[in-house]
Design a protein with these regions (language model features):
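Single conserved hydrophobic/aromatic residue that forms the stacking wall/gate
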Residues: 1-9
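Hydrophobic alpha-helical transmembrane segments
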Residues: 16-54, 59-65, 69, 77-168
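Interfacial transmembrane-helix boundary/kink motif in multi-pass membrane proteins
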Residues: 10-16
């Protein structure tokens, strides 16, 4: 008995859940298990949430040019630049506070910020494709847990590999 494309489409959510959430988030744990991982693991959240917060603030104040009007109409180019610069500065401050390498942390946070924006836009594309605004309703005004962690999910593997390459 052959299986049609319908079977493939029925299995996509399970595959998505395993790879997108399970495998990629496992890099948070893997980063924590590196030498010095108790400091490096925070870079994941510093990059993604720091970039998001700085991008929002700069975008609200100075945003004029839409970055991805179809996927995420409120995001601006100015906000994106502010997010990356903000994440780099947060990385430098974190390096000073933890006696880490400033250049290494700045590079990690800059690249991590870019990837976190890609993750956020990818999540927006998935939601638009499925015709939904948020992944859930757990956090009023913010959607579900996955909405808060979409950029973290993309950032975690990159921070892990950059930590291995630049710090270890």
């Amino acid at each position: 008995m052959s299986r049609g494309l319908g079977d493939v489409y029925k299995r996509q959510p399970a595959f998505f859940a395993i790879v997108y959430v399970g495998v990629m988030l496992s890099y948070v744990y893997q980063t924590r298990m590196l030498d010095g991982g108790k400091f490096h693991v925070w870079l994941i959240f510093l990059c993604s949430w720091g970039c998001d917060t700085c991008a929002y603030c700069v975008g609200v104040l100075f945003g004029k040019h839409k970055m991805a009007p179809v996927l995420s109409p409120k995001k601006s180019v100015e906000g994106a630049v502010g997010g990356v610069v903000g994440a780099i500065l947060l990385g430098i401050i974190y390096a000073a506070a933890t006696k880490g390498g400033m250049v290494e942390y700045a590079i990690i946070c800059g690249v991590g910020a870019l990837i976190s924006m890609v993750g956020d836009l990818a999540a927006s594309a998935i939601k638009r494709n499925q015709g939904i605004k948020d992944y859930g309703k757990l956090i009023p005004g913010h959607g579900g847990i996955l909405d808060r962690f979409d950029s973290v999910i993309f950032t975690a593997p990159i921070i892990y590999f950059l930590s291995v390459l630049l710090i270890h």
